[in-house]
Swiss-Prot record:
<feature type="transmembrane region" description="Helical">
    <location>
        <begin position="24"/>
        <end position="46"/>
    </location>
</feature>
<protein>
    <recommendedName>
        <fullName>Poly-beta-1,6-N-acetyl-D-glucosamine synthesis protein IcaD</fullName>
    </recommendedName>
</protein>
<comment type="similarity">
    <text>Belongs to the IcaD family.</text>
</comment>
<comment type="function">
    <text>Necessary for the synthesis of poly-beta-1,6-N-acetyl-D-glucosamine (PNAG, also referred to as PIA), a biofilm adhesin polysaccharide. Is required for full IcaA N-acetylglucosaminyltransferase activity.</text>
</comment>
<keyword id="KW-1133">Transmembrane helix</keyword>
<dbReference type="InterPro" id="IPR020510">
    <property type="entry name" value="IcaD"/>
</dbReference>
<keyword id="KW-0812">Transmembrane</keyword>
<dbReference type="GO" id="GO:0005886">
    <property type="term" value="C:plasma membrane"/>
</dbReference>
<feature type="transmembrane region" description="Helical">
    <location>
        <begin position="71"/>
        <end position="93"/>
    </location>
</feature>
<keyword id="KW-1003">Cell membrane</keyword>
<keyword id="KW-0472">Membrane</keyword>
């Protein structure tokens, strides 16, 4: 009788392209820095922080305070509408399940 042996698993040989991986990391870092800058400008606008760097970035991005506040107002209205819609949907589902049982 043949004694059982451990299975031999094939090894995975990987050769990463260093240039491609470096480019992906660089693009990702640039994207995250841009996101942080925009977040900083939005927070500065919401809390009415009049800092020179925030104002400079706002001018470079060609954004006015009123535009940002209008965007947040619109987002708030849509968030309320979606909240009401989903709340009513859940209540209707619970009401229908209550009638069935």
């Amino acid at each position: 009788m043949v004694k059982p042996r451990q299975r031999e698993y094939p090894t995975l040989k990987s050769s990463l392209n260093i240039i491609r991986e470096t480019a992906l990391i660089a693009i990702s870092c640039v994207f995250w820095i841009y996101c942080l800058v925009v977040l900083l400008v939005y927070i500065g606008t919401i809390f009415e922080i009049h800092d020179e760097s925030i104002n400079t970035i706002r001018v470079a991005l060609n954004i006015e305070n009123t535009e940002i506040l209008d965007i947040f107002e619109t987002m708030g209205i849509f968030a309320i509408i979606i909240f009401v819609f989903f709340t009513i949907s859940i209540l209707i589902q619970k009401w229908q399940k209550g009638r069935e049982s």
